[in-house]
Amino acid sequence: MNNIHNHKILILDFGSQYTQLIARRVREIGVYCELWAWDVSEADIREFNPTGIILSGGPESTTEENSPRAPEYVFNAGVPVLGICYGMQTMAMQLGGLTETSTHREFGYASVNLKAADALFAQLNDDVTSSQPKLDVWMSHGDKVTRLPDHFQVTAMTSTCPIAAMSDERRRFYGVQFHPEVTHTKSGLELLTNFVVKICGCERNWTPENIIEDAVARLKAQVGDDEVILGLSGGVDSSVTALLLHRAIGKNLHCVFVDNGLLRLNEAEQVMEMFGDKFGLNIIHVKAEDRFLDALKGIDEPEAKRKMIGKVFVDVFDDESKKLTSVKWLAQGTIYPDVIESAASKTGKAHVIKSHHNVGGLPDYMKLGLVEPLRELFKDEVRKIGLALGLPAEMLNRHPFPGPGLGVRVLGEIKKEYCDLVRLADAIFMEELHASGWYYKVSQAFTVFLPVKSVGVMGDGRKYDWVVSLRAVETIDFMTAHWAHLPYDLLGKISNRIINEVNGISRVVYDVSGKPPATIEWE
C-alpha cells in the first residue's frame, strides 16, 4: 500500500484569505499537506517532518515591528521553502534583505516578466508571442522587497515591482510576490507543481483510491471488532463517512437517521433507499418530527432555534445509542476546514469562527471514542472519494443544505404548515433549475418561508396567503457571493408554478442581495 503521508508539505498560515486555497492546490497536485499557524514550534515542525514548506500571504506589513515571522528553524530545516506574497517578504527580511511600503500598491491582474530561468519557473510562459517569457498573475500587496538577501537573484519583475520573484537555488529558497494559488494566476498550478514535485521531490500518492485504501486500513486498526454509531444525515460528509466505515467494519456500523421534519421533500425516503437498499447499511430510522416541532414551539430567534434543534438531536441520538449497548465509538463527518476553524490545530492558535453542527456537542457521559475518517480532507476531496465509493454525482454535487435544515429557512417560529409549504415550493424551484440547466450554474439555491401574508387573486376570488422568497447565488468560496441573474422567464415560470400548485402561497419574491452585505442564508 502506498504511504500517502510519506511526502508532505507544511503550509504556515500568516492570515491570507487564500491560505486554504494553497492547501487545496497542493492536494490537487497529489501531495498531502497540512496548514499550521505561523508561530508553530520547532519541535512540531521536526515531528511533522515536512518534505517542503510554503509560507502563505497575510494582511500584516513586514515593516511593522511586531509583524509575524516564520520560525527560524524553517530556514535551517534543509528542505525547500516557497514564500508567497507576505511569505516572500518575511523570508527576505529574515534572511538579511529589506522590505518597504510601496508607493504603488498592486491589487489585481499583472503581467510579470521572467528574468532568470530557475526551477520554479521551468517551462512556464503565458505569452508565446513575446521574446521574453511572461506570466499573467494575481497581485495583492502593499509592501515590496527592495533589497535581496545574500545569494538570492531576481527571477521576475513587473513595471512597478522590480523584485516580483526571487530565488536562492543552492538552498532551494523561492519567493513570489503574486498568488499562484488563485485561478486568476494562469500558470499558478504549474508553478506549484514545479515546487512540490520537481523541487521538493514529492511523489503524487494523494489520490482518491489511495486515500480510501489508507482510511479503511486505519479504521480497521482503530476500531477493530468494536461497534460504531454514526448520525447519518444524507449529506455529503456523513454519507462518505458511512461508506468508508461500512467498507472497513461492515455490520458493526450502526447509522442513526433522524427525520426531524425539517428535511427536503422526500429526503428521508431517498436516504433509506440509497443507503439501506442500495449499499446495505444498517440504518435505524427515527421518525422524530413531532418531538422537534413540539420543542421549537414559541421560539423565533435564529440562534435559539439552532440550539434547540441541536439539543433535541442530541437527545434523540442519545436515546438510540442507549439501545445499542455494545457501541464503543462515535463516528463524525468532521472535515479539514472544521478542524482549522474549530481550534483543533496542534498549535492551539486557530480561533473558533462558528460552532459546527458536527464538532462536539454530545454528552460527556456517552464515553465513546471518536472516529473521524474525513478530518484530513477538504470538501472537494470528500466528493471525489464519494464518487469513487459509488455515490451518484448528482447527490455529491447537490447544493449545500444547513444542518438545522428548514429550521433556518422558515423565518421566525417553526410550524409544520410552514415547513410543508416551503418544502413543496423549494421542490418546484429545484425541479425548474434542473430542467432549465441552471442548477449547476449557480452555487446554491433555496426557498425561504416569510411569516407574512399577502393578498392575491385566484379566479374571481381574493386570497390572503403566505409569501416565499427564492434565493440563488454564485460564489467561488462562499465568503462572498453575487445574486444569480436568473432569466426573467424562468423566474416567472417558477413563480406561477408555486402559486398555482402550492395551496397556501400567494406571492413569490426573488432575493437580489449580495454577500456582503447580506449573508447567503436568511437566518
UniProtKB/Swiss-Prot annotation:
PROSITE patterns: GATASE_TYPE_1, GMPS_ATP_PPASE. The keyword Nucleotidyltransferase does not apply. The gene is guaA. Keywords: ATP-binding, Glutamine amidotransferase, GMP biosynthesis, Ligase, Nucleotide-binding, Purine biosynthesis. ATP binds at S233, G234, G235, V236, D237, S238, S239. Residues 206-398 form the GMPS ATP-PPase domain. GO terms for cellular component: cytosol. GO terms for molecular function: ATP binding; GMP synthase activity. PANTHER family: GMP SYNTHASE [GLUTAMINE-HYDROLYZING] (PTHR11922:SF2), GMP SYNTHASE-RELATED (PTHR11922). Catalyzes the synthesis of GMP from XMP. This is GMP synthase [glutamine-hydrolyzing]. It comes from the Bacteria. It catalyses: XMP + L-glutamine + ATP + H2O = GMP + L-glutamate + AMP + diphosphate + 2 H(+). The active site is at C85 (nucleophile), H179, E181. Residues 8-205 form the Glutamine amidotransferase type-1 domain. It is an enzyme of class 6 (ligase). Homodimer. Pfam families: GATase, GMP_synt_C, NAD_synthase. Gene3D superfamilies: 3.30.300.10, 3.40.50.880, HUPs (3.40.50.620).
